[in-house]
């Protein structure tokens, strides 16, 4: 069946900001869909609030709306654009829930718009727990015994029938949000209460516990002619009880018997047919009881999911691309396989290698959070590796996570066997390491299985690794056979060096002298049965190399590895742009990365893709392989964040050509003393600072500067380990618990600028001329990490004279450091002094936002500058505007606001309360959104709607502010009262309001408890949903504790919470704008990026 001719335009709904459970994989799937649909000649309209995505680039769709993904906004877009169809299966749970809401409130019918990809009935059958249970039974399969509940009374009755422990699973949520295992009634009340709150239909399913069973997933696709393919089987290394996104997973499944696998396939195919997914993909999860082989169907996602992205990268079978084609009418046998070019998509992929995915966590950012892994997903990213066997893939994947202590180590004593077995029984992110240490301590396979319920086959592979490590350590000499044997099982040069007490580079020298190097195999979807036309490679210590020679010069781009807090999809965005720009300029582009979620690891983003860990050893081998294939013009390290930057100096020492800013210049900007001299020569000032490698040193510096001070380790990204310290006792505590402090790695002590305006600048420099990308003003004051602060382009309160000072200072720094490419500088403006906080000669996390706000692709331009072009040439080519730059935008240009999205609701302490939502100098956001409109209040309002679901326009606001903020709060709070809000406040705050003629009611503090006549405390009232908005600025440590309870309650019920006065002023402006809009009867204003850019260009022309 060829493509439907009745469809002319399609609205694709994206997934919004990156949050835990819904990450970059949806940018990857959405980007693929937009490309395919446009190639089919359809007009593509896209809505997505996340500016850090490739899919929101103006060239990916005909109309790109960077707007909040809410039913009201999407309705406004449908009313304006009148698409024939809506495709919602590629934007995760956000897109699905929005599409269902539009269907149910009649919007789709009103505008004659069809839902394609999966119909509402199929979505409901797959997502509604009770209906899905019926589907499974009709297919002759089993699901776990369960009860569907809509209230706490039903929950308690259900648990009484099933017996503890029970699993709680809310309907229509994502990444296991609100789910968990309840071992007793207290657990059940807490978890089910959360689940009922997070489920949009207030519904949870209670299930019998299948803890300890084996967990599998199948990724399937079906078309309207009823062809079904099983793309991939995936097995979880951890047994049931850990969310699949937090588990180490392996493809293909390793421990199934053929009969079990066939049974699972049969069930999967029956289920996808019964649910009625007939134009796309789905993912089905199974549990298998290891005692008797009983198979239970756990759940299904009738859409593209995190596992689909993994399955796509693992097999080379592009699920999202094919799903988009099926949605517009094609069948599987009509769609060609891109990789082989000679087989159709109805051929099931075959794997002749093993794929392992390892999650990456961020518990160090939330020290109070409980690190136990449960059914609520907590990982923030993942790394994937391919190998010829399980052990090779596993060891490569572990070192790809770039986490200290993630790889197996055989150094030192393993510890007590009984203690290790006890600790390994609890699933945490360190469990696999504990298993290896228990093996070293003499634990038997039976004891380990009893403790962890990890399948004996996987445990046996771990024993094999321990045996090989023993051979390497104990043999008289490192023979070529032994070295090759260890490398075939994934041992790195560093691990072999540790076992032999040799430095890593000596091991590498020996290995190269013996001619032992990896070969590169190809992912071809068909186990080499047909030739592959796309070079998608992985390394292995095998015999035959499959890389091909080439004539053109290549540029190697090092990606950013697994997503983590502080280094997210924004850096991947810059790498992808560089690949596109350099390919257009006539180079062959080579991408090295190990993150399966991203666009950079799509096989058609660059000319060659190496799915490899970003370690010195692996990168050197890739560069060597590419130099064998043809000329290499250089390697780009400044786009992938801190990971590739950290390799720059060592790569250069090894003779690898680094293009762009030199490693020496990178060091110059990072090293305080040298950078201080650059500033001095330019006549610029930094806040007073010093470096210390001991507490007495730090104490002396702090005394000289005066408290508060900002302390942090050198060389970090995302403010890791930073703290604002108010007194000497806290400083001593920090120095005692900080990361390893040594003369090589000193701690930096800075003056902390209270009440300063923070300014962020992204610029390009070619050695002669500077192009200012954009000047952003932060809404929160300095001291909150720039990645967590909201920021605005053009800056709303800076005058032309200040902007001119910022421009001159940025250019002086670019010249002084010797930048070629991108530069990010952070300034603080305090008492009319412009302080330089830091300069980073690399792509920053604001590059995508600035590019979207100003309509200029900065990362593309930067890649060309690194390859030797000048800014003048790029202006002539049209890659940069012919005149002017982002530092002086026209007066009537649209205002863009970037807001950070924080994951506090996911993390709980061991007692089950949420971790504190206070912001500070350590970055904790996982993603971002953008609001864009004609003025600041409306744009800020949109950013809040996109990030947290919006600000209220009526109701009760609770106010409790620190003494230092009491003067500044009066005007915004008075405005709130004038707008009709009811105010409640703590006693001290209420008194100040009363003196200024503002009426408020005093509420009971949390520490006072509920009164005898039943008056709730503020925490109780927030929990009961009586408070529409919380304003709570913290002061000192004691008040922080009372404030913590208030903020935790607000986080738990999803009330907007404001913790700084600057944010309060912005919020009040946004609320007023929304009320005015409502009064005037106006709906939501929506405009596409293409329209904004056209307006901006017209304004530039008008200036000329």
From Swiss-Prot:
List residues binding Mn(2+) 4: 838, 840
Q: Where does ATP 1 bind?
A: 129, 169, 175-176, 208, 210, 215, 241-243, 285, 299
Q: Which residues bind Mn(2+) 2?
A: 299, 301
Organism classification, top ranks? Bacteria, Bacillati, Actinomycetota, Actinomycetes, Kineosporiales
User: What's noted on cofactor binding?
Assistant: Binds 4 Mg(2+) or Mn(2+) ions per subunit.
Q: Which reaction does it catalyse?
A: hydrogencarbonate + L-glutamine + 2 ATP + H2O = carbamoyl phosphate + L-glutamate + 2 ADP + phosphate + 2 H(+)
- In residue numbers, the region (Carbamoyl phosphate synthetic domain) covers 548-948
Family per record: Belongs to the CarB family.
Cofactor names: Mg(2+); Mn(2+)
State the source organism's domain of life: Bacteria
Q: Where is the ATP-grasp domain?
A: 133-328, 676-867
Annotated residues that bind Mn(2+) 1 are located at 285, 299
Q: What is this protein called?
A: Carbamoyl phosphate synthase large chain
Query: Which residues does the annotation say bind ATP 2?
Result: 712, 751, 753, 758, 783-786, 826, 838
């Amino acid at each position: 069946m060829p493509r439907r001719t009745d469809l002319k335009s399609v609205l694709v709904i994206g997934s919004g900001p990156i949050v835990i459970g819904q990450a970059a994989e949806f940018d990857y799937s959405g980007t693929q869909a937009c490309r395919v649909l446009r190639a089919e000649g359809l007009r593509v309209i896209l809505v997505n609030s996340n500016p850090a995505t490739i899919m929101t680039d103006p060239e990916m769709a005909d109309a790109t709306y960077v707007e909040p993904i809410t039913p009201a906004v999407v309705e406004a877009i449908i009313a304006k654009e009148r698409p024939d169809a809506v495709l919602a299966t590629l934007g995760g749970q956000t897109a699905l829930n929005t599409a269902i809401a539009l269907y149910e409130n009649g919007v789709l019918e009103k505008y004659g718009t069809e839902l394609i990809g999966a119909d509402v009935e199929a979505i409901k059958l797959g997502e509604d727990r009770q209906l899905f249970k019926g589907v499974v039974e009709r297919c002759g399969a089993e699901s776990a015994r369960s009860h569907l509940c809509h209230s706490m009374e039903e929950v308690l009755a259900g648990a009484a029938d099933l017996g503890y422990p029970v699993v709680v699973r809310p309907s229509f949520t994502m990444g296991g949000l609100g789910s968990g295992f309840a071992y007793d009634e207290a657990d059940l009340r807490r978890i089910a209460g959360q689940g009922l709150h997070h489920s949009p239909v207030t519904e949870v399913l209670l299930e019998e516990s299948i803890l300890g069973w084996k967990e599998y997933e199948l990724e399937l696709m079906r078309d309207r002619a009823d062809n079904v393919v099983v793309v991939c089987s995936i097995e979880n290394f951890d047994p049931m009880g850990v969310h699949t996104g937090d588990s180490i997973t392996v493809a293909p499944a390793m421990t199934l018997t053929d009969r079990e696998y066939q049974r699972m396939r049969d069930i999967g195919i029956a289920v996808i047919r019964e649910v009625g997914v007939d134009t796309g993909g789905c993912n089905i999860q199974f549990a298998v009881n290891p005692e008797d082989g009983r198979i239970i169907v756990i759940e299904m996602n009738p859409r593209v999911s995190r596992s689909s992205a993994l399955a796509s990268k693992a097999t080379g079978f592009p699920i999202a691309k094919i799903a988009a084609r099926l949605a517009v009418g094609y069948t599987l046998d009509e769609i060609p396989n891109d990789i082989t070019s000679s087989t159709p998509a109805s051929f099931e992929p075959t794997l002749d290698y093993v794929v392992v995915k390892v999650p990456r966590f961020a518990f160090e950012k939330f020290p109070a959070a409980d690190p136990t892994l449960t059914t609520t997903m907590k990982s923030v990213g993942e790394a994937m590796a391919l190998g010829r066997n399980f052990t090779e893939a596993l060891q490569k994947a572990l070192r790809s996570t770039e986490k200290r202590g993630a790889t197996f180590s055989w150094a030192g004593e393993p510890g007590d066997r009984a203690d290790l077995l006890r600790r390994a029984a609890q699933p945490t992110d360190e469990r696999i390491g504990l298993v290896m240490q228990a093996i070293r301590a003499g634990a038997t396979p039976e004891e380990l299985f009893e403790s962890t319920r990890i399948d004996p086959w996987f445990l046996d592979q771990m024993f094999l690794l321990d045996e090989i490590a023993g051979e390497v350590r104990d043999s008289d000499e490192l023979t070529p056979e032994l070295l090759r044997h260890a490398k075939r099982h994934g041992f790195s040069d560093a691990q072999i060096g540790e076992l032999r007490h040799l430095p890593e580079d000596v091991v590498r020298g020996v290995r190269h002298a013996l001619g032992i190097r990896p070969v590169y195999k190809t992912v071809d979807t068909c186990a080499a049965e047909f030739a592959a036309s796309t070079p998608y490679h992985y390394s292995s210590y095998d015999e035959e190399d499959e890389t091909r020679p080439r004539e053109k010069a290549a540029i190697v781009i090092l990606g950013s590895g697994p997503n983590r807090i502080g280094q997210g999809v924004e850096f991947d965005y810059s790498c992808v742009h560089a690949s596109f720009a350099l390919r257009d300029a006539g180079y062959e582009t080579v991408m090295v990365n190990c993150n399966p979620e991203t666009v950079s690891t799509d096989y058609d983003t660059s000319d060659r893709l190496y799915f490899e860990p970003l370690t010195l050893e692996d990168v050197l081998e890739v560069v060597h392989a590419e130099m064998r294939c043809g000329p290499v013009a250089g390697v780009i390290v400044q786009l992938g964040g801190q990971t590739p930057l950290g390799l720059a100096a060592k790569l250069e020492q090894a003779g690898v050509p680094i293009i762009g800013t030199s490693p020496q210049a990178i060091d110059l900007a990072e090293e305080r003393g040298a950078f201080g001299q650059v500033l001095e020569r330019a006549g610029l000032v930094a806040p007073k600072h010093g470096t210390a490698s001991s507490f007495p040193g730090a104490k002396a510096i702090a005394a000289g500067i005066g408290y508060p001070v900002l302390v942090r380790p050198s060389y970090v990204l995302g403010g890791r380990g930073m703290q604002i310290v108010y007194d000497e006792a806290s400083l001593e505590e920090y120095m005692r618990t900080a990361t390893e402090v040594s003369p090589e790695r000193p701690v930096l002590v800075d003056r902390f600028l209270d009440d300063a305006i923070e300014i962020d600048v992204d610029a390009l420099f070619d050695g002669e001329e500077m192009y200012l990308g954009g000047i952003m003003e932060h809404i929160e004051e300095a001291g909150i990490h720039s990645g967590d602060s909201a920021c605005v382009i053009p800056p709303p309160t800076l005058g032309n004279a200040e902007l001119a000072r910022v421009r001159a200072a940025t250019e002086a720094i670019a010249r002084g450091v010797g930048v070629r490419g991108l530069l990010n500088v952070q300034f603080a403006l305090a008492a009319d002094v412009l302080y330089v906080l830091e300069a980073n000669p690399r792509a920053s996390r604001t590059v995508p936002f600035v590019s979207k706000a100003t309509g200029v692709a900065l990362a593309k331009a930067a890649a060309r500058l690194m390859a030797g072009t000048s800014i003048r040439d790029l202006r002539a080519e049209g890659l940069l505007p012919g005149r002017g730059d982002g530092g002086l935008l026209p007066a009537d240009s649209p205002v863009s606001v970037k807001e950070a999205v924080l994951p506090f609701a996911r993390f709980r302490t061991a007692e089950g309360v949420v971790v504190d939502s206070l912001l500070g100098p350590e970055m904790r956001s996982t993603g971002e959104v953008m609001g864009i409109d004609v003025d600041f209040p409306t744009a800020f309002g949109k950013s809040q709607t996109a990030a947290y679901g919006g600000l209220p326009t009526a109701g009760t606001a609770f106010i409790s502010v620190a003494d230092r903020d009491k003067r500044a709060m009066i005007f915004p709070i008075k405005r709130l009262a004038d707008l009709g809000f009811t105010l409640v406040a703590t006693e001290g705050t209420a008194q100040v309001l009363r003196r200024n003629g503002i009426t408020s009611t005093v509420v009971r503090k949390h520490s006072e408890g509920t009164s005898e006549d039943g008056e709730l405390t503020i925490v109780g009232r927030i929990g009961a949903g009586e408070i529409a908005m919380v304003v709570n600025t913290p002061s000192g440590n004691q008040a922080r504790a009372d404030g913590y309870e208030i903020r935790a309650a607000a986080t738990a019920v999803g009330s907007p919470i404001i913790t700084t006065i600057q944010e309060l002023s912005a919020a009040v402006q946004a609320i007023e704008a929304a009320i005015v809009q409502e009064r005037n009867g106006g709906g939501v204003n929506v405009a596409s990026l293409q329209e904004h850019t056209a307006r901006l260009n017209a304004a530039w022309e008008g200036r000329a």
